[in-house]
């Protein structure tokens, strides 16, 4: 029988609904508690999903929790991940892992030191298309790359998110920080 990991979810906003709906298709983890900086939101999430709500600090320090699922806004990802690792928790976070390279590097070093796993969504960056691209570039089939261009035709977070304002706050990066990584 597979081990069932006990997961604590931080950030009970819009994206958490997707995780709650899809987690029932997996038999190796169970979201047992949730937290949010807004306790009203955490309590509502807990009630809807029949789990326990608590503060962010309580969740991160909870001995029963093995993995923290970090669904907060990008500028909070680093602090939540850092505290989680410091408290012996594996961490899986929405993108990006951190809003700057140094913080991301620090999280990877910390996870290695602690012997913990750290992962990020979307995991499609390691999918077939990207792996094939890496293969073609590495083998020299494509040749030296001199320029890259990307087009992402999507109306942005404001088209679907019930509360897009935090994404556009100072230093948040807007759609680029959401879709770019």
Predicted regions and their residues:
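N-terminal Rossmann-like dinucleotide-binding module
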Residues: 1-48
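Conserved G/P- and acidic residue-centered "switch" motifs that form tight phosphate/ATP-binding loops
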Residues: 11, 95, 140
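Beta-loop-alpha module in the N-terminal Rossmann-like domain of NAD(P)-dependent dehydrogenases
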Residues: 19, 51-110
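Acidic-histidine catalytic/liganding microenvironments
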Residues: 26, 48, 62-63, 127
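Short, Asp-centered acidic motifs that coordinate Mg2+ and/or phosphate
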Residues: 33, 66-67, 147
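Rossmann-fold dehydrogenase core element
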Residues: 106-124, 143-148
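Predominantly a Rossmann-like dinucleotide-binding segment in NAD(P)-dependent oxidoreductases
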Residues: 124-181
């Amino acid at each position: 029988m597979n081990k069932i990991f006990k997961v604590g979810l931080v950030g009970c906003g819009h994206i958490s609904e997707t995780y709650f709906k899809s987690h029932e298709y997996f038999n190796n983890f169970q979201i047992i508690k949730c937290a949010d900086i807004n306790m009203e939101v955490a309590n509502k999430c807990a009630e809807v999903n029949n789990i326990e709500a608590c503060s962010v600090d309580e969740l991160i320090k909870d001995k029963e929790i093995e993995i923290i699922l970090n669904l907060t806004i990008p500028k909070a990802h680093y602090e939540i991940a850092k505290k989680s690792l410091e408290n012996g928790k594996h961490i899986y976070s929405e993108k990006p892992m951190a809003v700057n390279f140094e913080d991301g590097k620090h999280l990877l070093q910390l996870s290695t030191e602690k012997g913990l796993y750290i992962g990020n969504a979307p995991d499609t960056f390691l999918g077939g298309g990207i792996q094939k691209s890496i293969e073609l570039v590495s083998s020299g089939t494509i040749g030296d790359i001199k320029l890259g261009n990307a087009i992402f035709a999507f109306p942005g977070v404001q088209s679907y998110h019930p509360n897009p304002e935090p994404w556009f706050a100072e230093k948040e990066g807007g759609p680029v920080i959401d879709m770019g990584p």
